[in-house]
C-alpha cells in the first residue's frame, strides 16, 4: 500500500470527479483490489480534471498540502501546468506530482508553502497529456476504487506502453536511461493485463493507437528470455500476453 494513501482517500472522498491517479500508485490500487502484489511505490501522480466547482476542490487540496507539510515546486507553460509536492510528513504520501492541461487556469500557490526548484526534465507525462487523443482516452477510462479516483487497468496499459517506448527511444538516441524504469514499464503492461476482464475490447484513436501498435511490434521483437512473465508468476508467457493485447486493443 502507498504510504499516506489513507489520509489522501479521506481528504478527497467527496472529490473523485476532480482528479485521476495514474502511474505506480494506480497500479498498486488496481492490483491490490485483485489481491495481486505490486512493487513498493511512494509517489502519487495525478491529473486534475476541471469541473464546475473546481475552486472548492482546490481549497481542500491546499488544506491537504499544508497539513502534510509539503514543499512545492511548479512550472506553468502555455498549455500545461505541473506541480511537485515533496517531503510530506508521516501519514502523507512522500511526493505528489500533479498535472493540468486546462488553458488559462492554474492552482494559485498559497502563502506558507515552501518553494523548491524544478528542473527542466519534469516528466514525459506532460507531453502525452498535451495530446488530445491520450487525454480523451484517459477521460473515458476513469473509475473509483476504494474511494480513490484512478485510471482503469485497460486504459492505464497504453500509458505504460507509451512510457516504455519513450524510454526505449531515448536510450537508442544515446541518452542516459534508468534501466530499472525501462524494465518497470515493460512489465507493468503485463501486470495490469492480468486484471483486465476477459473479452474486454477497448477503442482508441490517433497517437494512442499508434503507440499500441508500436509497443506490440517492439515487445514481440524482444528475446523471450528478457520478458520472463511465467517466472514472475503471471498466468501467461510473452507470446500469449501479446495475443491478449491484440484481442483487447486491435
Q: Model-found features: residue ranges?
A:
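Compositionally biased terminal segments of proteins
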Residues: 1-250
Amino acid at each position: 500500500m502507498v504510504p499516506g494513501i489513507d489520509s489522501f482517500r479521506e481528504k478527497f472522498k467527496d472529490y473523485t470527479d476532480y482528479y485521476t491517479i495514474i502511474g505506480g500508485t494506480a497500479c498498486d490500487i488496481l492490483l491490490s483490489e485483485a489481491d495481486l502484489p505490486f512493487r513498493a511505490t511512494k509517489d502519487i501522480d495525478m491529473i486534475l480534471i476541471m469541473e464546475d466547482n473546481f475552486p472548492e476542490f482546490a481549497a481542500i487540496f491546499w488544506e491537504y498540502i499544508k497539513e502534510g507539510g509539503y514543499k512545492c515546486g511548479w512550472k506553468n507553460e502555455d498549455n500545461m501546468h505541473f506541480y511537485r509536492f515533496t517531503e510530506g510528513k508521516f501519514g502523507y504520501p512522500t511526493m505528489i506530482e500533479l498535472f493540468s492541461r486546462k488553458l488559462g487556469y492554474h492552482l494559485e500557490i498559497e502563502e506558507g508553502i515552501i518553494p523548491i526548484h524544478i528542473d527542466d526534465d519534469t516528466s514525459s507525462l506532460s507531453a502525452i497529456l498535451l495530446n488530445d487523443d491520450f487525454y480523451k482516452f484517459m477521460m473515458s477510462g476513469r473509475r473509483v476504487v476504494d474511494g480513490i479516483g484512478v485510471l482503469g487497468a485497460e486504459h492505464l496499459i497504453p500509458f505504460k506502453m507509451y512510457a516504455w517506448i519513450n524510454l526505449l527511444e531515448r536510450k537508442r538516441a544515446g541518452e542516459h536511461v534508468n534501466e530499472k524504469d525501462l524494465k518497470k514499464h515493460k512489465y507493468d503492461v503485463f501486470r495490469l493485463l492480468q486484471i483486465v476482464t476477459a473479452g474486454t475490447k477497448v477503442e482508441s484513436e490517433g497517437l494512442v493507437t499508434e503507440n499500441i501498435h508500436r509497443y506490440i511490434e517492439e515487445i514481440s521483437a524482444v528475446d523471450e528470455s528478457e520478458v520472463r512473465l511465467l517466472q514472475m508468476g503471471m498466468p501467461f508467457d510473452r507470446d500469449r500476453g501479446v495475443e491478449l493485447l491484440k484481442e483487447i486493443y486491435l
